[in-house]
């Protein structure tokens, strides 16, 4: 079986982490996964985007793939239309953005294409995400299913002090960690504005993006430039070490459909302050006490209070350990991959997809090997 995953661009983020996890999980089952991108980088002018989209459409058309998997709105539209015209029977789209945060034209086209039945499977990654589409046409929602993300728990390789030295971070001051692209949605500006009222804390931003210069300038203006550490995009191993090095994970996003970075931090038992969003309340729930505080994503004073309280009273180690085990079990990669294999098996049994593996049609039993 051959699958093509389609992204907007090469910029690393939670969606790329998800796709890599899916690829690694499916490969042992003799499922080949390829990846292509619509655009080489964000911020292209409209005409350049059209040219790039045309190239991606041509690649899809010529590829003769058994399944197409799209992440993000424009990729979903391309997969739905070109995949349907090409006769690819399994056209999977992931809802990685809430409708309210999607550009109006893309939102309208996505709704139209989904309502016309051009998506064969429409995946929501959380119940909160599914609820965002409650007002969409029934014909759109008919293809929706729930497959929660699954991740490998981060595996730090450095001790706390060693990791801090590795990234030139202070050894004895409280470290606040945020992981994610530097963009308006991730709302790191709020954390920088909170720093003047958190006099000992240092803020570590692990991610790249268009806001780097603006965030440095803001920190300098507020007099906290020496306590802001922007490390850029880092490989998973370095991120894992940062989870161990930091004292508190902070995640003030204005919207999330799942929150992969927050779940990763939870998997290592980090105490955290996160935005009070339905998706984050859902994915970070645990039986018993949780080392998680929620704050409104635009209330700087609430974040100052929540961060101060979390630093002053860290959770007991046993509470953090129970929390980590719960999240690891619920969002394991194995569980997610099993859900995808079940999906492919249902499609194989129903005869809706003519899969070829070395020129031979795949049976449902072969999919699970």
What are these regions (language model features)?
Residues 216-234:
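Nucleotide-activated donor-binding/catalytic signature segment of Leloir-type glycosyltransferases, i.e.
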Residues 156-169, 316:
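A short helix/loop element that forms part of the nucleotide-sugar donor recognition site in Leloir-type
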Residues 271-275, 281:
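Short hydrophobic beta-strand element within catalytic cores of glycosyltransferases
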Residues 60, 233-234, 241-246:
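Short alpha-helical donor nucleotide-sugar binding micro-motif in glycosyltransferases
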Residues 254:
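Aromatic "clamp/platform" in nucleotide-sugar-dependent glycosyltransferases that forms part
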Residues 16-21, 174-197, 201, 210-216, ...:
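A conserved mid-protein helix/loop that constitutes part of the nucleotide-sugar donor-binding site
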